[in-house]
From Swiss-Prot:
The protein's name: DNA-directed RNA polymerase subunit beta
Keyword Nucleus: no
Species for this entry: Acidovorax ebreus (strain TPSY) (Diaphorobacter sp. (strain TPSY))
Family designation: Belongs to the RNA polymerase beta chain family.
Catalytic activity reported: RNA(n) + a ribonucleoside 5'-triphosphate = RNA(n+1) + diphosphate
Assigned EC number: 2.7.7.6
Subunit structure of this chain's protein: The RNAP catalytic core consists of 2 alpha, 1 beta, 1 beta' and 1 omega subunit. When a sigma factor is associated with the core the holoenzyme is formed, which can initiate transcription.
Swiss-Prot/TrEMBL GO biological process terms: DNA-templated transcription
SS bond partners: none
UniProt GO molecular function: DNA binding; DNA-directed RNA polymerase activity; ribonucleoside binding
């Protein structure tokens, strides 16, 4: 068992000294959790069918089934589904260009009911047919959270969309010129019709369905069963009047009078005037009226006029309706009412301030009379031009909001809806109810009346994340819905014909829907694989674009902006520059999704000012209820918040609060940023714009030949490397049994081995694999034979990782000084030594493909027999016509020989005879071989040959298969070797000292077995020993059986592999054979390459200077890179300067350790110095855990520099950096290097003259990256090449081998110079004058250098365009 220690295998080799002021409370969660969890929940592959929860595939099937035939006598029920084992593993899919997927098989029952004996209440089953039906293939997620689609690795990006529910907003006064706020509400379901309510400038309330024509809202209220009386009763309170002979008595309600201007004298019971006419009624007046016991107030007649009747007034004698609800009172109407003897009158109470008559006014313009008429009106709006029959009208209205098949609010929508309208329960039906609609209209009217607040749509409580699982489920549902339609139509036939479920179900729609989504959806993206950081960021990306999301053009400023709720959920720094800024975001480091898809972030609970270790995840909505302190708040020894006031956040605002009011505290200062931003040291000293560039450019760093750990990191490097899946980690603890460049074999610890399984883990390393960006993925072992490992230890480094830490660049000695103008405007000056040492050399792998197709004239052939090629040009091709692995090729070299049949030419009899005799075949085929492109060269590192089923394999293909089988057999042999060794060890322990009944080499009965005897017998003959004890004999037998079983299973595995390799390959239609050749290209650093630091300090290499000309230090050390100091102050990314200082300290310490090792200092002295480095400041490390050997091994690793971690927002202070510099450079050393007092600057000498520069220069080490914008990929020149078909102008761009555009402004420049002939040449023969350019060619051949410019083709295009408009235009030559 590996020793229990806080340090892993790689950490023991190199501990990163951290300056973090507080220990981590919560480990950084697994960074691909969101993707992995979402897809696991979608598939539920490892859950027993009976125990599956209703989500993902299960929910999709449940929504589509049961399917019932039109007559109701046949039904198809879904029982369960299961997923088959994928036919090919991930690596095989990548090589063969297949999709890594699993077949879905659903068990369905076809139930046929007996027509005769069935009644409408109970149906009698006639027969049931059960069958498993193939339901398409579902792509599987790899361990790294990506998908392999058609052989390429893709990522499904999560989408941030508006949560279902109800939203209230106003137009911010933009619609109407007066600036009046128009309020609106919108009910957004997960699936189904949107329902909008909106006020117009006249305060009439309208509704619209799916953004169609708007209609008065009372039509909808009538359609849901309300009549005008109940509508008014729902929205208004009533004023009660008692009609007198003249005037009336108003029932007195104090709060309704307050603030009104009295239109008449208001008196109390005694007739005393309390409020005079035209005075405003105040709270004092209403109090006097109450105290005087006033219950009614006399009001004059004109006070009643214009008031609105609240309910129908019916004549008690005749039953005639005298006044309808919502009718206005007029003098005539009052007269009529008095005449009919009506005494009590109820009118609605409205006022200008907070009780508007909006619904009443809307009801007035609504012409529908009853519920049916209202539904007809809605039908006409939804289906204009169709005759509204009663059935159709009712069916449509039901289908709009009340039918679960067509309308689904979803759990999230219902939860948000209920929360918004003030219900306590979070669950409920997934369709709307009448109460729901009424509640929304009530809230909207209240808003217009000035009560309540509108919603903020950019609040993360109103936006939720749709993950891979949910997106895939929606696609699967679409496919199933199409199947459902088809099955429903055919179910009727199942009664007459003996059909089985698979005859009815065609899985094509599902496959098509999934294929379309995974292959072509906007959210299914080609994985960014430049380096591990790019991969991990891509999988954690959250996009607001995509189907059902925003579009770039429509997204305004608010959506893109940083919102307070982004804190700890979405990174405020990492987002692309350009049109997508703010629409594509990255998940913050600790963020996760809750069950509803809202982003949550963790906080530590604070109780009475004491910070506990309890951690709660809060969503944006919950967070608003609490006061949350920052992670760097100072705590005393007991963990209490110190100081009177603590900096905290309340409802998104930063405030200072007393310690006892704080309820939560951040878990880490890095909580607010994403992975990429958290890898930038001293981020807190950089301007946000530059930090954004720094985080984005880290993702473009190319993996170099020998990755080097950053001297100054942040402590996240290890987590990011391990979670990205680039490094290889041990699945189980154990001892390394065998290591070479391609595989690591680990013998698993006994306590971790599962009974009945092989106790061996074999890790096959990836060698020179091409990434999506053509960079090189390559793994190197970092363990030795005999090393003890624990589970999770890093055992092999991948691209851009060094000892299990992300290492995207190299540590370079940087000097900040101008150098002869070569670092003007962000240019970078580099020493030749950097290039000579291959520090920035990267390997790029290109894939070249050739296909032999079946053409009309016959099959193409891959062959060495190519017409018109000399033997010299063919000498690197093998007999199959395919290049050897290891060949170095130049532009134009043949990689794969291929000939295509030409059209048959008619032959004379003589030619036919000659051809029959000599077999001359060359003339009827043309050479279409695969050649190396212009401008690329390299070494062939791999060749793959794919052959269609039924076509003879060539020798090369056979050899590739044999090699692959040999490799596979090696793995199996290793496993077998360890299993056998293990078994024989157990047998030895079992038999030693036991009594035998006999055995090989004439073992006498009753003899004790000893080790010497066992050693003399062949191990496989040990099984022939017959132990006397029954129990021992059975154990021996069981070991023998287990061994045989293992051998048998290995043979089966080998056979399966052989079958897989020898079966024909799936190739595109018409392709008989396909050859892929992989070229490795070495790219050295050269002028024109883009480089950058991690702080947004980017530049282009301007010159590579001989090392002897570079500025050097007093001890002769030359600088590696010279940067312009003017690039720092205006850009405000000071983090780079601090990084340089701290890197300088790390290097100095490394050199001191190196000196100690060189003079073979005692381990105690080393320990003392390491203690001083690690434990004098910042976080303490437990070096006592390491043995002397481990200390020595670590010291050797540290000679290149001591790595530091300066966590984001909790980094090293200026004091700490100064202390480290003092420790690294004692006075004597500082003097020898010519350092200043602070050790941050040095006096440099000019490499060319040897003179000392007069001022000291800032020098130190910075982690500098080479980016994926390489000059080799961009540089391009053309003499003649392809032309566009219509305009006859040269194409553009390197890919098309295009020309340089001579644009409008360039034409002006030539005009300004008066260079008429140059201009004519540019606009004619060098562009689109077809005759002219052939003429020029002829003239050059003749040796005349004359130009005859003709008519540019673009003029002819213009003439044709004008003619197409029906205008005849002719060119007359004068």
């Amino acid at each position: 068992m590996a020793q229990t220690s806080t340090y892993s295998y790689t950490e023991r080799k190199r501990i990163r000294k951290s300056f973090g002021s507080r220990d981590s409370v919560l480990k950084v969660p697994y960074l691909l959790q969101m993707q992995r969890d979402a897809y696991t929940a979608f598939l539920q592959a490892d859950t027993a069918p009976q125990k599956r929860s209703i989500e993902g595939l299960q929910a999709a099937f449940n929504s589509a089934f049961p399917i019932v035939s039109h007559n109701g006598f046949v039904e198809m029920k879904f029982v369960e589904y299961n997923l088959a084992k994928p036919a090919f593993d991930v690596r095989e899919c990548q090589t063969r260009g297949l999709t890594f997927a699993s077949a879905v098989r659903a068990k369905v029952q076809l139930i046929i009911y007996d027509r005769e004996s069935s009644t409408s209440q109970s149906k009698v089953v006639k027969e049931v047919k059960e069958q498993e039906v193939y339901m398409g293939e579902v792509p599987l997620m790899t361990d790294k959270g990506s998908f392999i689609i058609n052989g390429t690795e893709r990522v499904i990006v999560s989408q941030l969309h508006r949560s279902p529910g109800v939203f209230f907003e106003h137009d911010k006064g933009k619609t109407h010129s007066s600036g009046k706020l128009l309020f609106s509400a919108r009910i957004i379901p997960y699936r189904g019709s949107w329902l909008d309510f909106e006020f117009d400038p006249k305060d009439i309330l309208y509704f619209r369905v799916d953004r169609r024509r708007k209609m008065p809202v009372t039509i909808l209220l009538k359609a849901i069963g309300l009549n005008p009386e109940s509508i008014l009763a729902n929205f208004f309170v009533n004023d009660n009047f008692r009609l007198m002979d003249s005037g009336a008595q108003l029932e007195f309600v104090p709060e309704r009078l307050r603030g009104e201007v009295a239109r008449f004298d208001i008196t109390d019971k005694a007739g005393k005037v309390i409020v005079a006419k035209d005075k405003r009624v105040t709270a004092r007046h209403t109090r006097e009226l109450e105290q005087s016991g006033t219950t009614h107030i006399s009001v004059p007649e004109d006070f009643l006029i214009g008031r609105v009747v609240a309910r129908n007034i019916v004549d008690g004698d005749t039953g005639e309706i005298l006044a309808k609800a919502n009718e206005e009172l007029t003098e005539a109407l009052l007269k009529k009412l008095r005449a009919a003897g009506v005494q009590d009158l109820q009118v609605i109470y409205t006022n200008e301030l907070d009780q508007g008559a909006y619904i009443s006014q809307t009801l007035r313009i609504d012409e529908t009379v009853d519920e049916f008429a209202a539904r007809v009106a809605i039908y006409r709006m939804m289906r204009p031009g169709e005759p509204p029959t009663e059935d159709a009208v009712q069916a449509l209205f039901q289908r709009l909001f009340y039918n679960p098949d067509t309308y689904d609010l979803s759990r999230v929508g219902r939860m948000k809806f209920n929360a918004k309208i003030g219900r306590d329960e979070a669950t409920g039906p997934m369709v709307l109810s009448n109460d729901d609609i009424l509640a929304v209209v009530k809230i909207l009217v209240d808003l217009r009346n000035g009560k309540g607040e509108v919603d903020d749509i950019d609040h993360l409580g109103n936006r939720r994340v749709r993950c891979v699982g949910e997106l895939a489920e929606n696609q699967y549902r679409t496919g199933l819905a199409r199947i459902e339609k088809a099955v429903k139509e055919r179910l009727g036939q199942a009664e007459q014909e003996p059909l089985m479920p698979h005859d009815l179900i065609n899985s094509k729609p599902i496959s098509a829907a999934l294929k379309e989504f995974f292959g072509a959806s906007q959210l299914s993206q080609f994985m960014d694989q430049t380096n591990p950081l790019a991969e991990i960021t891509h999988k954690r990306r959250v996009s607001a674009l995509g189907p059902g999301g925003l579009t770039r053009e429509r997204a305004g400023f608010e959506v893109r902006d940083v919102h307070v709720t982004h804190y700890g959920r979405v990174c405020p720094i990492e987002t692309p520059e350009g049109p997508n800024i703010g629409l594509i975001n990255s998940l913050a480091l600790y963020a996760r999704l809750n069950e509803y898809g809202f982003i949550e972030t963790p906080y530590r609970r604070v109780v009475d000012g004491k910070v506990t270790m309890e951690i709660d995840y809060l969503s944006a909505i919950e967070e608003g209820k609490y006061i949350i302190a920052q992670a760097n708040a100072t705590l005393d020894a007991e963990g209490r918040l110190t100081g009177d006031l603590v900096s905290a956040r309340e409802k998104g605002e930063s405030t200072l609060v007393s310690a006892d009011r704080v309820q939560y505290m951040d878990v880490s200062p890095a909580q607010i940023v994403s992975v990429a931003a958290s890898l930038v040291p001293f981020l807190e000293h950089d301007d946000a714009n530059r930090a954004l560039m720094g985080a984005n450019m880290s993702r473009q760093a190319v993996p170099v030949l020998r990755p080097e750990k950053p001297m100054v990191g942040t402590g996240i490097e290890r987590v990011a490397a391990v979670d990205s899946g680039t490094v290889v980690t041990a699945n189980r603890g154990g001892v390394v049994d065998y290591v070479d460049a391609t595989r690591i074999v680990v013998r698993v610890n006994d306590d971790e081995a599962v009974a009945g399984e092989v106790g061996v883990d074999i890790y096959n390393l990836i060698k020179y694999q091409r990434s999506n960006q053509n960079t090189n993925i390559h793994q190197r072992p970092i363990v030795k034979k005999g090393d003890k490992l624990a589970k999770g230890d890093v055992i092999a480094d991948g691209a851009s990782t060094d000892l299990g830490e992300i290492a995207i660049g190299q540590n370079m000695l940087i000097a900040f000084m101008p150098w002869n103008g070569y670092n003007f405007e962000d240019s970078i000056l580099i020493s030749e030594r950097v290039v000579a040492e291959d520090r920035y050399t990267s390997i790029h792998i290109e894939e070249l493909v050739v296909m032999a197709r079946d053409t009309k004239l016959g099959a193409e052939e891959i062959t060495r027999d190519i017409p018109n090629l000399s033997e010299q040009q063919l000498n690197r091709l093998d007999e199959s016509g395919i290049i050897y692995v290891g060949a170095e090729v130049q532009p134009g070299d043949t990689l794969v020989g291929k000939v295509t049949p030409k059209g048959e030419t008619t032959l004379t009899p003589e030619e036919k005879l000659l051809r029959a005799i000599f077999g001359e075949k060359a003339s009827d085929v043309k050479d279409t071989s695969l050649r190396v492109d212009q401008g690329s060269q390299g070494t062939v590192i791999d060749v793959q040959v794919f052959t269609r089923e039924g076509i003879q394999r060539d020798k090369r293909a056979q050899q590739i298969i044999d090699d692959e089988l040999k490799r596979f057999r090696l793995d199996l042999n290793d496993q077998l070797r360890i299993v056998e060794a293990d078994a024989f060890d157990r047998i030895e322990k079992l038999l030693t000292g036991r009594v035998a009944n006999g055995g090989p080499q004439k073992l006498a009965k009753g003899t004790k077995i000893d080790k010497a005897y066992l050693a003399s017998v062949e191990k496989f003959h040990w099984f022939d020993i017959r132990p006397a004890e029954e129990e021992v004999a059975t154990q021996l037998e069981s070991i023998k059986n287990a061994l045989e079983q293992t051998r048998h299973s290995f043979d089966l595995a080998f056979e399966e592999k052989r079958k897989k390799l020898t079966q024909g390959d799936e190739l595109p239609a018409g392709v008989l054979k396909m050859v892929k050749v992989y070229l490795a290209v070495k790219r050295r650093l050269q002028p024109g390459d883009k480089m950058a630091g991690r702080h947004g300090n980017k530049g282009v290499v301007s010159k590579i200077v001989p090392v002897e000309d570079m500025p050097y230090m007093a001890d002769g050390t030359p600088a590696d890179i010279v940067l312009n100091p003017l690039g720092v102050p205006s850009r405000m990314n000071i983090g780079q300067v601090l990084e340089v200082h701290l890197g300088w300290a790390g290097k100095g310490m490394g050199q001191r350790i190196g000196d100690m090792l060189q003079r073979e200092a005692k381990t105690a002295e080393l320990r003392k110095f390491l203690e001083e480095i690690y434990n004098s400041r910042g976080r303490k490390e437990e070096l006592s855990q390491l043995s002397d050997d481990e200390i020595l091994a670590m010291a050797r690793e540290l000679t290149s520099g001591v790595p530091f971690a300066s966590p984001v927002f909790d980094g090293a202070s200026e004091e700490e950096i100064k202390d480290m510099l003092k420790l690294a450079y004692p006075d004597d050393l500082a003097q020898a290097k010519g350092l200043t007092e602070t050790r941050t600057q040095a006096y440099l000498y000019d490499g060319r003259t040897g003179e000392r520069f007069e001022r000291p220069t800032t020098v130190g080490y910075m982690h500098y990256l080479k980016l994926h914008h390489l000059v080799d990929d961009k540089m391009h020149a053309r003499s003649t090449g392809p032309y566009s078909l219509v305009t006859q102008q040269p194409l553009g761009g390197k890919a098309q081998f295009g020309g340089q555009r001579f644009g409008e402004m360039e034409v002006w420049a030539l005009e300004a110079y008066g260079a008429a002939y140059v201009l004519q040449e540019m606009l004619t023969v060098k562009s689109d004058d077809v005759q002219g350019r052939t003429k020029v060619y002829e003239n050059i051949v003749k040796g005349e250098h004359a130009i005859e410019a003709g008519m540019p083709e673009s003029f002819n295009v213009l003439v044709k365009e004008i003619r197409s408009l029906g205008l005849d235009i002719e060119l007359e030559r004068s």
